[in-house]
Amino acid sequence: MSKLDLNALNELPKVDRILALAETNAQLEKLDAEGRVAWALDNLPGEYVLSSSFGIQAAVSLHLVNQIRPDIPVILTDTGYLFPETYRFIDELTDKLKLNLKVYRATESAAWQEARYGKLWEQGVEGIEKYNDINKVEPMNRALKELNAQTWFAGLRREQSGSRANLPVLAIQRGVFKVLPIIDWDNRTIYQYLQKHGLKYHPLWDEGYLSVGDTHTTRKWEPGMAEEETRFFGLKRECGLHEG
């Protein structure tokens, strides 16, 4: 696998970009997660960043990437509505793993947004999408720009939802390379990695949460529910960061 030209690929239509990366992705599927990270650092342009929501299994990708690339900027988009347990988990992992945490937030405070728009998350799919654009997408775009990112690592997995089932290891999103080192991991592999490295699930895992985001759009799992139904009232799975 040879080095890839981000500028040249960005000039191609989306379908052509996918085709251009197909051979590389076929080879990346054969590598383990650590090998994928190492390949990306050797063959894709910097600067490099890692995003995390500090969700249920966040410790895995944070540990895996950070041990290979210490001090990599870790981007968190903070909505102001995370669970108290999440904020404590962020502090715990930042200290334990010595993370180079970069927190980005909307330009409008949560209170100001509610005054202007009401509770957007109660306004159907359109309201949720506007909320996500303000609190997730715009801050992430700003983070990528300010950090001069050209390669973005994330911890998505195909097993998590139907919308992620066909994602490749390597793609281009928001004009940068996006690498998903643990895309093909199952829950058992996640558990084994956490055990091997003395890491923990998010504290709400023990209370029945399979996925954790904002307090107002996250539900505990109940028998018969798919994992994606625990977020955004089952109306959508993605918060916007990993779409497009």
UniProtKB/Swiss-Prot annotation:
<dbReference type="InterPro" id="IPR014729">
    <property type="entry name" value="Rossmann-like_a/b/a_fold"/>
</dbReference>
<dbReference type="GO" id="GO:0004604">
    <property type="term" value="F:phosphoadenylyl-sulfate reductase (thioredoxin) activity"/>
</dbReference>
<keyword id="KW-0963">Cytoplasm</keyword>
<comment type="pathway">
    <text>Sulfur metabolism; hydrogen sulfide biosynthesis; sulfite from sulfate: step 3/3.</text>
</comment>
<feature type="active site" description="Nucleophile; cysteine thiosulfonate intermediate">
    <location>
        <position position="239"/>
    </location>
</feature>
<protein>
    <recommendedName>
        <fullName>Phosphoadenosine 5'-phosphosulfate reductase</fullName>
        <ecNumber>1.8.4.8</ecNumber>
    </recommendedName>
</protein>
<dbReference type="GO" id="GO:0019379">
    <property type="term" value="P:sulfate assimilation, phosphoadenylyl sulfate reduction by phosphoadenylyl-sulfate reductase (thioredoxin)"/>
</dbReference>
<comment type="function">
    <text>Catalyzes the formation of sulfite from phosphoadenosine 5'-phosphosulfate (PAPS) using thioredoxin as an electron donor.</text>
</comment>
<dbReference type="GO" id="GO:0005737">
    <property type="term" value="C:cytoplasm"/>
</dbReference>
<dbReference type="InterPro" id="IPR011800">
    <property type="entry name" value="PAPS_reductase_CysH"/>
</dbReference>
<dbReference type="Pfam" id="PF01507">
    <property type="entry name" value="PAPS_reduct"/>
</dbReference>
<dbReference type="InterPro" id="IPR004511">
    <property type="entry name" value="PAPS/APS_Rdtase"/>
</dbReference>
<comment type="similarity">
    <text>Belongs to the PAPS reductase family. CysH subfamily.</text>
</comment>
<keyword id="KW-0560">Oxidoreductase</keyword>
<dbReference type="GO" id="GO:0070814">
    <property type="term" value="P:hydrogen sulfide biosynthetic process"/>
</dbReference>
<dbReference type="InterPro" id="IPR002500">
    <property type="entry name" value="PAPS_reduct_dom"/>
</dbReference>
